[in-house]
Each structure stands twice: as structure tokens, then as C-alpha cells.
């Protein structure tokens, strides 16, 4: 009689930044602390976090915050990285700090770094999670996270109630999860101000990766590319030849780091007890209100 295989437990890795940004621009600025500082992003995030915890009763969990909004290793590598974005308002930065404190007070492990982005911290945990025991559920709407998906993992855009598995990524992006970093390096990523290779769009990048697999594979077969049935293939070949170093540098931007320092091993990233004093301090100073504080305290327990 064969042994039953225990079902994989969910390990939730949450990108908090997107929910804070969404709340900042969608919640009314009538929410404020005692000094009149806006708390709309914090309120929106707190309500979302309540709903998420009540829905999942998550135990193995970590929440990542973007502390390195303009100071990550990518900015040092390529100063134009995300330079097309307006700086985060100071009022929002203050609320990021509150949201980190709130999350930690709820006993939830917090990830943040001045050198690595939230995506890198999530990637570093996912890389070290024991896949014999866990499947990772990435709670985010960030397309870059799709490159991390293993067979049993789920990318969950919670706010829009959409989920993606590794098998669905190719129909969504035209490439496999493992090729997303190469694809974005070639085709560019306007959201992060990465131009890609001049004249190589999404369709051409997909075709090249379908044929050769990786950026390395493309350059290993560079002399053969002129034989592919692609429009302006000779021009594309010449562009690739002259852009080699730049494209490999771009891939360092689009590929998530898996070696970021973590506060603990994944096995220790579990929800602990509520820090009552810490929770009271955050909810009191930010005027979140007693009703929301009670709901937060009991969420998912």
C-alpha cells in the first residue's frame, strides 16, 4: 500500500507596496493622524490586510516592503532605472513606516532593505523555501514575480481576485516563467524605464527565446539568426551584436535577486503573537480607530 503524500502547505509572500500605493491614490485624504498627517494609505492597507488574513488564516507568511525606492543596487548599476517615475510623496513614505510597524505588531515577519527591492526579498525567500513541504503563494500584481513561479506555486492578484500558475504564464506573456527576465531585457520594460534592444519588440523577443531559450543561447547562435523568418532579421542581428553588454546588464535589472540577506530562514518566517503595545501605539498614533484595531488583532487567528 503506497503512502499518502501530504498536501503542500501554503507559504504566503506578500508585496505590501502595491497595496499601499493603491490605497494612497484611492482612499480619501480625510484619514489623518492627530497632527493632521494623512493616513489614507495606512487605512487602506490595514483594511486589505484584515481581509487577507481573515480569508487565508495564513501561518507561514512574510510581508515585503519597498524601503529602497531610489537606492537599490539597480540604481547603482543603471542610474536611469525607474527614473521615469515621480518620487514617492513624503506623506506616503511616512505611511510605509507605519504599515511596517503595524504588520510587525501583528506578529507577521517583515522584510525590507535599503539595497534590495521587495521583489528581491520575496525571491530570496522563495528560493530557499523547502518545496517538499510548501507551495509558495505570491500575493502581488507585479508581473516580474511571474519569473519565480514553480509548478505548484500561485501568483495571486488578491485585489482583482485573479490567480496565475506557471502553466498559464506563456499564454499571458508569450514566454516561460524562466524566460521573463531575458524577455524584458530584450523587449524592454517601460514601467521600470528599461529600453531593451532598439527595434526589438515583444514579438521578436518571444521568437528569439522560443528558438534559443535564453540570452546566452541567442548569443551562442548569433551567426545563425539571419536564417530565421523574422522581418528585418539582419538589422536585428546587427543590433544584438552591438548591444551585447547592454542587454546582459539589462538582465541584471530584470532578473530578481535570490541572495538578499533575510532576517531569518524561511522555516522561521511564521506568524507569531500580537505585540499589544506595538499595535496600540500604531493604531493610537495614526488614529486607525478601535474597531479596526480589534479586527486587526483577531484577523486570521
Placement of each model-derived feature along the sequence:
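Noncatalytic, basic helical substrate-engagement surface that gates or grips nucleic-acid strands
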Residues: 2-136, 145-162, 248-249, 255-263, ...
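Non-catalytic nucleic-acid-binding/docking modules located in mid-to-C-terminal regions
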Residues: 6-8, 58-59, 152, 165-301
